[in-house]
Amino acid sequence: MDQVKIEINEETHIKNFNITLFDTAGQERYRAITKNYFKDSHGIILIYDITSKSSFGHIEKWLESIKETLSDWKKSGYMIMILGNKLDLVENNGKKRAVTSEEGKNICSKNDIYWGGECSAKTFEVNQIKEIIETFLKKVYIKKVLIYKLYLNIIMQNKNNV
């Protein structure tokens, strides 16, 4: 588990985000541990290996686990992003792709979650990964702000109707 601090300058307002990163390496034994962290977070990025059908299959299991733990995840503004990894193996090393981009997009569409695209953690194109994470964090932040404003609006309307 690593903690990373990221700042995003959005229209001159700097927002600080603390990110906790878990690399479970597809190990099912970590599922029980991470459930506790779902409750205290605002979003999660699920990453699979595009050269492994098995890795992609675990995404559905993680989604089920998130939905069981956070039954109201959509209403609460909880964001989920799916990201394909190991693009370098397909592009540079001639390894066969086991999961198409379309399959990644389809699982996102089916579950109403955000598709982050595909990348390579090995070649770590810093700008690409930074951009993916920043986009995700902006979506988390905007969704939380919109829900908060909606909540305040409802309170004010109820107050005025009394």
Task: List the model feature ranges, each with a label.
Residues M1-Y148:
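TRAFAC-class small GTPase G-domain
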Residues V145-M156, V162:
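Cationic, amphipathic, low-complexity alpha-helical segments enriched
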